[in-house]
Regions:
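C-terminal segment of classical bacterial N-terminal signal peptides
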Residues: 17-26
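Sec-dependent N-terminal signal peptides
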Residues: 5-15
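Kelch-like beta-propeller repeat domains
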Residues: 3-7, 27-229
Length: 229
């Protein structure tokens, strides 16, 4: 797995297949003119993969990586210089294309869904820096992959939007859910993005979740921008 970092006024941000959730303020505030990519050469790295889930864990100051292609269920953390494989007693089942975001209200990283060994998943897990805990909310979003998920600082909840489920009709989803640390709640906004599988990031500067683009049901791609919050 290739690892790079963006160097911005003394702060670094990790880059891999996807990063979602809260990003350190120093990275958010940096300008493109001062940022550079620097390839890292850690002594140990996770095995090569794609479609891993990754988010910044502000409680521990590390980036957390889980799973990916190849039926992987390993957990790794990156502290800015070193990859460390974690060995929790319990872990989520192997999966790829899961959603992950840091929940600042609870100080945990939230993982949802993805594609498992043979089917789509709709389970919810939280990581507290040392332990994975499966959550068992009474209601959950349906199983999916390619979901957009990010933390909304205004409401103190993790926001989930859309994704792809090959076994439902329609396959592309356009629903909005929020996670408050114990409960998933389906939202019914008057206006919302059209169904898609997308990426989303939290914008702490404005207190909104920003969503851009994604794949459309007709095989094309979107180039629109939406905000939530």
């Amino acid at each position: 797995m290739k690892v790079c970092r963006i160097v911005t006024a003394g702060a670094t941000a990790l880059a891999a297949s996807a990063i979602v959730g809260t990003v350190p303020p120093a990275v958010q505030a940096s300008s493109a003119s001062t940022a550079t990519w620097t390839k890292q050469h850690p002594a140990t790295s996770p095995p090569a993969r794609e479609d891993a889930a990754m988010a910044y864990d502000a409680a521990t100051g590390t980036a957390v990586l889980f799973g990916g292609s190849g039926d992987l269920d390993d957990t790794w953390t990156w502290n800015g210089a070193t990859w460390t494989q974690q060995h929790p007693a319990t872990s989520p089942p192997a999966r790829q294309a899961a959603a992950m975001a840091y929940d600042a209200a609870t100080g945990t990283v939230v993982l949802f869904g993805g594609f498992g060994s043979s089917s789509l998943l709709g389970d919810t897990w939280t990581w507290n820096g040392t332990t994975w805990t499966q959550q068992h909310p009474a209601t959950s979003p349906r199983a999916r992959q390619g979901t957009a998920m990010a933390y909304d600082a205004v409401t103190g909840a993790v926001v989930l939007f859309g994704g792809f489920n090959s076994r439902t009709s329609p396959n592309y989803l356009g629903d909005t859910w929020t996670w408050d640390g114990t409960t998933w709640t389906k939202q019914q906004p008057a206006a919302h993005p059209s169904a898609r599988d997308v990426a989303a990031v939290a914008d702490a500067a404005t207190g909104t979740v920003v969503l851009f683009g994604g794949g459309s049901p007709d095989g094309g791609v979107f180039g629109d921008t939406w905000t939530w919050g």
